[in-house]
Regions:
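Short, contiguous hydrophobic alpha-helices characteristic of membrane insertion segments
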Residues: 252-270
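Outer-membrane beta-barrel translocator/receptor signature
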Residues: 1-19, 31-33, 114
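Residues on the lipid-exposed face of transmembrane beta-strands in outer-membrane beta-barrel proteins
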Residues: 20-24, 116-122, 178-182, 196, ...
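Short secondary-structure subsegments characteristic of cysteine-rich extracellular domains
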Residues: 9-23, 283-293
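Long hydrophobic segments that form regular secondary structure
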Residues: 1, 121-126, 256, 369-382
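Transmembrane beta-strand segments that form the barrel wall of outer-membrane beta-barrel proteins
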Residues: 2-3, 266-275, 318
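Solvent-exposed loop/turn segments connecting transmembrane beta-strands
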Residues: 276-281
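Surface-exposed loop/interface segments of Gram-negative outer-membrane beta-barrel transport/assembly proteins
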Residues: 6, 23-113, 131-133, 137-250, ...
């Protein structure tokens, strides 16, 4: 448990973490662990209250408000304990601590997360292993904020109605991976390690919601919930919600490692990845890579030099990498309705009449979207 109390207005943070790791051999046959299972799990809950950062824009924000206020001006009235009123230098003067408190202090964020991995390892023969992993990722969160009505200077810093905001959501993802590996050697000089595997990963299973309203029945944070607002009114009530974009990635891969007397080493890798982020016919990408190394200090002609150079390895590699990081279904064209950010109005007949709300093309379709491929070559020494 971690609790960090601060001297800032109304701030606090608590976090609780639980970790669980274990491994069990269920079937043992002589020197072979025939069947082994295990898991690693991490659960985290956090609760954050009050201030977390300065609010406002680049120019007009809490830091600017504090810097422009005279250091002789008290934040609180010693007689009443309330926020002090500023000296009326001009009509825009106000107490920056009071504004920061009213706009930022009364809020709470809660976060829950679970990351778990469960595995099963089967070793029917020496150095032959079949490993299966299933991982799950879960998170959920909620936010609640309350801004009371206030009057800091009678002109610019006035808020006549209290406001409540609630947000939240959840997200889920999972991954399954299965690999088969085998290690062997020839004459104890030529050592090989081979691996074949497949992975499927699904992410983006989740949703978000958000809402705000004014005129809460009870003027305090404890009762600050959307259900306690007096009315639902256009211009003062906002509600929104959306689902995440689901994305699936399937992969097949293979790898061979070769080592000759710890002198000469080589690795060949080939993988094929299929992503649902692309249209049919463009979802699969193929990415090979090779690498080689020469341990020069293992050569006989280096024996006399080991007193000054005990290790020298020259290595080189080449490979291709794939990138599928874009929003799900971006290859499809989408339409959008006009809103406060995107104006789309149409006239029927005379343009002097009343315009009608319309729709517009937000994204053009592109069925040719596919993997972004980059090539990388490295040469170096250790």
């Amino acid at each position: 448990t971690v609790a960090v109390p601060d001297d800032e207005v109304g701030s606090g943070f608590d976090r609780y973490t639980i970790r669980l790791n274990s491994e069990h051999t269920l079937i043992k046959l002589k020197d072979l662990d025939l069947l082994k299972v295990g898991e690693t799990m991490t659960m985290v809950y956090s609760d954050k209250k009050g201030l977390d950062q300065a609010t406002g824009q680049t120019t007009w924000n809490d830091f600017r408000n504090a810097f422009k206020t005279s250091p002789l001006f008290p934040a609180y009235d010693e007689a009443t304990g309330e926020f002090a009123d500023p000296v009326k230098i001009n009509k825009d003067e106000f107490n920056p601590v009071a504004k920061m408190y009213y706009n930022s202090a009364m809020k709470q964020s809660k976060n829950y997360s679970l990351n778990g991995n469960f595995y099963l390892i089967l070793e029917p023969l020496k150095n032959l292993r079949w490993r299966n992993n299933f991982g799950i990722r879960y998170s959920s969160w909620s936010y609640r904020g309350y801004v009371p009505a206030y009057n800091l200077n009678g002109s610019t810093e006035v808020k006549y109605r209290n406001t409540v905001t609630q947000q939240g959501g959840m997200g889920l993802g999972w991954q399954f991976e299965s690999t088969l590996s085998y290690d062997f050697s020839i004459n104890n000089q030529h050592k090989f390690s081979a691996l074949l595997g497949t992975t499927i990963d699904k992410s983006g299973l989740g949703e978000n919601y958000s809402g705000s309203n004014e005129d809460v029945e009870f003027d305090d944070f404890f009762h600050a919930y959307l259900g306690n607002a007096k009315t639902v009114e256009k211009g003062r009530t906002t509600l929104s919600g959306s689902a995440w974009g689901v994305s699936t990635l399937a992969s097949f891969f293979g790898r061979i490692n070769y080592d000759y007397q710890n002198k000469y080493m080589a690795t060949v890798i080939m993988r094929a990845d299929g992503s649902s982020n692309f249209a049919r016919g463009h979802r699969w990408g193929y990415f090979p890579s090779v690498s080689a190394g020469w341990n020069v200090t293992e050569e006989e002609f280096m024996e006399d030099a080991k007193s000054v150079l005990n290790y020298l390895k020259i290595r080189a590699s080449w490979g291709e990498n794939g990138n599928n990081k874009l929003d799900a279904f971006r290859y499809l064209g989408t339409m959008a309705l006009a809103n406060s950010q995107n104006a789309a109005y149409y006239y029927f007949g005379d343009k002097s009449g009343t315009p009608f709300i319309g729709s517009f093309i937000e994204y053009n379709s592109n069925k040719e979207l596919t993997w972004e491929t980059s090539r990388q070559t490295d040469i170096g020494f250790d």
